[in-house]
């Protein structure tokens, strides 16, 4: 695969996990596919989420990865963006609800800390009064504007397609 110099990905929830998983993937060709990423309340540590999540989502990672058993733990480690943050070299923007019970803010904060320690360009916006998904119109607009700013100004530096 040839890296697409102008390709970025930004997704929410399990999509945020997918974004982070692609950027930290063991295969360098897949890691290099995206120039930057965005994670809206995405999972960064599936193992800790599987151990400590609310009842409604308690079996979700069984379907997404596998049931968390001693025999499957390595699958969780292999797919954990925060545990594989050392592989990531692309800028990432993060958006998180402060009252999120599905993907707690600590998930995002661990990833942000790991990337900042590596010197990776990051943007982190924590929205007070928001949960898993944003409901307040002002916060939705703020997130959209911040994501556009991040990709346009910090990543692509205002370059426009020919």
Task: Explain the meaning of each model-derived region.
Residues 1-162:
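Active-site-proximal cap/loop segments of hydrolase catalytic domains
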């Amino acid at each position: 695969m040839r890296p697409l110099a102008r390709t970025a990905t930004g997704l929410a929830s399990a999509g945020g996990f997918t974004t982070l998983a692609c950027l930290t993937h063991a295969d360098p060709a897949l890691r290099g596919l995206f120039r930057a990423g965005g994670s809206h309340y995405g999972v960064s540590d599936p193992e800790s989420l599987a151990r400590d999540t609310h009842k409604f989502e308690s079996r979700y990672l069984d379907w997404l990865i596998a049931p968390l058993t001693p025999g499957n733990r390595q699958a969780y480690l292999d797919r954990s963006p925060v545990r594989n943050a050392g592989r990531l070299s692309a800028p990432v923007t993060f958006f998180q609800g402060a009252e999120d019970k599905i993907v707690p803010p600590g998930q995002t904060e661990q990833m942000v800390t790991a990337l900042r320690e590596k010197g990776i360009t990051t943007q982190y916006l924590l929205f007070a009064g928001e949960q898993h998904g944003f409901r307040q119109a002002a916060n939705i607009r703020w997130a959209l504007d911040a994501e556009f700013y991040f990709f346009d100004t910090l990543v692509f530096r205002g370059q426009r397609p020919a």
